[in-house]
Amino acid sequence: MTTLKFIVPLIVLTACTDRQSGVINAKQSTGKDTVFKHDTIFYTNNNWQDGFGLTHDPEVDSIWSKPVKFYIDNPRCSPIAIDFYQGQFRPTDNNTTAALLSLATTNDNQLRPFYRWCLNKTIQIQDGALAEYTGVPARQYAEKFPKEFFEYMDYDTTGDKYKDWIAAISYSGFYDKDDYKNPLEIRKHLTQTMKQNCINCNEQLKKRIDKFAADCFP
């Protein structure tokens, strides 16, 4: 009986502690200010998408000259990406975030612009631990689709997007095999991969690839 009296207050205390956390286990709560998605629950009482320019009307919002409805109505579209657009999933340092960002290198030409947008917006809001997750997928996208990458960068005439991506790759865009103390070797691998994937690559684009590699790993 004494043991039970001790356990009950402990359970109550644990529940209160969990309720104060921004991310809790999906099996523990049904609070009205939370959204159940995947393996986590995120509180949604703060608008973390400020500055995204969204109305959350998929027929009004557009990404890469197409309404968002074009992407989210596609039966192949990832639910994680849809949740991200709707503001129901905020990236943080977990496996769901890693899965979302890895979608940017998909071979699906119809959905890739949407996934790339998710990666770009995550780069915009990254801080702390989240910054550890953006560099590799950003580098992989640039390596796999070099022409598309530069076209995407050029769409922003301010140059801020390019700087953001450079910062992300410079910070966390190292592969396991990379020697961070040898940036010359990393640049060599990066330029070789991009040029191999750059079909009918002219000299101007090759020079841009060289500069990009130098910017990422000076």
Ranges and model annotations:
Residues D18-Q28:
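Bacterial Sec signal peptide processing site at the extreme N-terminus
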Residues D33-T34, D39-T40, S62, T157:
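Coil residues (strongly favoring Ser/Thr
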Residues N47-W48, T92-A104:
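Boundary/linker elements of alpha-helical solenoid repeat scaffolds
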Residues T14-A15:
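C-terminal motif of bacterial Sec signal peptides marking the signal peptidase cleavage site
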Residues M1-P9:
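Sec-dependent signal peptide recognition
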Residues D61, S65, C77-D83, L111-N120, ...:
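Amphipathic alpha-helical scaffolding segments comprising HEAT/armadillo-like alpha-solenoid repeats
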Residues Q86-G87, A98-T106, Y115-G128, Y133-R139, ...:
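Short secondary-structure capping micro-motifs at structural edges
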Residues I125-P218:
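Extended alpha-helical scaffolding segments
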